[in-house]
From Swiss-Prot:
Single GO BP term: tRNA modification
Similarity comment text for this entry: Belongs to the GTP cyclohydrolase I family. QueF type 1 subfamily.
Sites where the protein binds substrate: V73, E74, S75, H92, E93
Claim: Oxidoreductase is one of the keywords in the record: yes
Function summary: Catalyzes the NADPH-dependent reduction of 7-cyano-7-deazaguanine (preQ0) to 7-aminomethyl-7-deazaguanine (preQ1).
Compartments where found: Cytoplasm
Protein name, entry field: NADPH-dependent 7-cyano-7-deazaguanine reductase
Region (Disordered): 1-23
Record organism: Chelativorans sp. (strain BNC1)
Pathway(s) served: tRNA modification; tRNA-queuosine biosynthesis
EC numbers for this chain: 1.7.1.13
């Protein structure tokens, strides 16, 4: 049975953190066993942050793939972490990379990649990609399934 004693957010009424810096990513133990590494995917199709200059909302479809080693990121804490960006002002690139780095810091995975598919602002969609290296050998890493942005063209 998984040891959940260190989880404080799961199963509790929890306020959304005021900022990404105030958010806590919690982890649970993972036994990966023998064979190819497992790949875990989180998809956040309605991610929101604020433009650091205008304060206007920015929206993205975020896809996170990682190969856990000994720790899993607990999904409620991840949800609260992602929600904490709602009132956070940062550029698309900064938000995307910050998310990836925080998960790496918390879980120390074998591998992680994140894709931030940002909806157009000023007529330009911005896609941001970051990863820690090459995927583990023989791991099944499916395509993200996010099509390139197409307007009415």
């Amino acid at each position: 049975m998984t040891d959940t004693r260190n989880l404080t957010q799961l199963g509790s009424k929890t306020q959304a953190p005021a900022s990404p810096e105030a958010a806590t990513l919690e982890t649970a133990p993972f036994s990966r066993g023998d064979g190819p590494a497992a790949i875990v995917r989180f998809t956040c199709p309605e991610f929101t942050s604020l433009c650091p200059v205008t304060g206007q909302p920015d929206f993205a479809h975020i896809v996170i793939d990682y190969a856990p080693d000994k720790l899993l990121v607990e999904s409620k804490s991840l949800k609260l972490f992602l929600t904490s960006f709602r009132n956070h002002g940062a550029f698309h690139e900064d938000c995307t990379v910050m998310i990836g780095r925080r998960i790496v810091e918390a879980t120390k995975p074998l591998w992680l990649r994140i894709g931030g598919y940002w909806y157009p602002r000023g007529g330009i969609p911005i896609d941001v990609f970051w990863q820690t290296g090459t995927p583990p050998k023989d791991a099944w890493v499916p395509e993200t399934g996010v099509p390139p942005y197409r307007g009415r063209g």
